């Protein structure tokens, strides 16, 4: 396997890692139930997506 000829400096390593940060998910409020959910996904609380029922949720007994 290939090996580096020279050691990378701390500055060069840090510059490469500037893009490795975690990105917070974009959230939206569900117009059906008012809960927060991730964009372009089914609401976990009510099961609606874009105004239509996508997943039938069981009622809590």
Curated annotation (Swiss-Prot):
GO terms for molecular function: structural constituent of ribosome. Residues 1-20 are annotated as: Disordered. Belongs to the bacterial ribosomal protein bL32 family. This is Large ribosomal subunit protein bL32. NCBIfam families: rpmF_bact. The keyword Ribonucleoprotein applies. The gene is rpmF. PANTHER family: 50S RIBOSOMAL PROTEIN L32 (PTHR35534), LARGE RIBOSOMAL SUBUNIT PROTEIN BL32 (PTHR35534:SF1).
């Amino acid at each position: 396997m290939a090996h580096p000829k020279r050691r990378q400096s701390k500055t060069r390593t840090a510059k490469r890692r500037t893009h490795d940060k975690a990105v917070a998910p974009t959230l939206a409020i569900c117009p059906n139930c008012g809960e927060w959910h991730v964009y372009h996904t089914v609401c976990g609380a009510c099961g609606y997506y874009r105004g239509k029922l996508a997943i039938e949720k069981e009622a809590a007994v």
